A protein has these predicted regions:
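ER/Golgi luminal nucleotide-sugar-dependent glycosyltransferases, focusing on the catalytic module
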Residues: 23-254
Length: 254
């Protein structure tokens, strides 16, 4: 049986691009954080039972995407995996791309700093911690002098993304979001905004109590909406190779 295509709703119109010189490329100092979870926790499976759960399939999906980011772009890539999987399949790439490839690996269930997530069933909240942890542990982000960090869900590769970023001056951009405000496979920000956009405590902070039973997508949206519009880069819709989504189905664009 073929998985249903999950994103068949009408594509949101993209805002017209202004002041983009097609002949100019910007040297933005961007780092991509690819978030991965090979072994899903039972509490997450119970909360999202339709998600891809087979470990082998999840590994294959991640490996395919990670290799494309490495072989088909020149971007600094930080892979973060939060279930203890070490990606032995990438030993060759770790050496070949050592100047711009790094893995931050940990097991959330045994990491004391993540103990507050023990009873949390929100997949997004666990991911926010992994983004925070990856940035804190990363040596590559510091060594590459990256000042703009973009989280991309690890299973997805976006062929157009690097060229898109080159056409935009990110020096005055505080946050980057997908074309659909309530999607969060792609979320980025200037490093000065990192602790605001990707705060590890997320729903647990008093000022976000109203979001306690909501999705991380809503929190991201409201945070980015609070920033000046001229300082937010809204991405176009990116076509991607059909990829199994984390919540099931097949994703064909982001």
């Amino acid at each position: 049986n073929v998985d249903p295509v999950v994103n068949v709703d009408p594509v949101v119109n993209v805002d017209p691009v202004v002041n983009v010189d097609p002949n100019k490329n910007y040297d933005n100092k961007v780092a991509i954080i690819l978030t991965c979870t090979v072994n899903r926790q039972s509490k997450i499976v119970e909360h999202i039972p339709q998600g891809q759960s087979d470990e082998k399939e999840r590994v294959e999906t991640y490996i395919k995407s990670i290799k494309k980011w490495l072989y088909e772009t020149s971007l600094p890539i930080v892979v973060v995996e939060n279930s203890g999987y070490e990606f032995p399949e990438l030993e060759f790439e770790k050496d070949m791309f050592k100047e711009r490839f790094e893995m931050v690996l940990y097991n959330e269930t045994t990491l004391q700093e993540a103990a507050y997530l023990k009873d949390n069933h929100s997949k997004g909240t666990h991911e926010v911690f992994s983004i925070y942890y990856a940035k804190r542990q990363s040596k590559l982000i510091i060594q590459s002098a990256c000042n703009f960090i973009i989280k991309v869900t690890g299973r997805f590769y976006i062929p157009e993304f690097e060229n898109y970023l080159k056409k935009h001056d990110l020096s005055n951009i505080k946050a980057l979001r997908q074309n659909r405000a309530l999607n969060c496979q792609i979320v980025g920000c200037h490093i000065d905004q990192f602790n605001f956009i990707f705060n590890k405590r997320c729903f647990y902070r008093d000022e976000y109590a109203e979001y306690e039973n909501d999705y991380i997508e809503i929190l991201y949206k409201d945070k980015i909406d609070s920033l000046p519009n001229e300082n937010v880069l809204k991405c176009p819709v990116f076509n991607i190779e059909p990829t199994t989504g984390g919540c099931g189905g097949t994703v064909t664009y982001l």
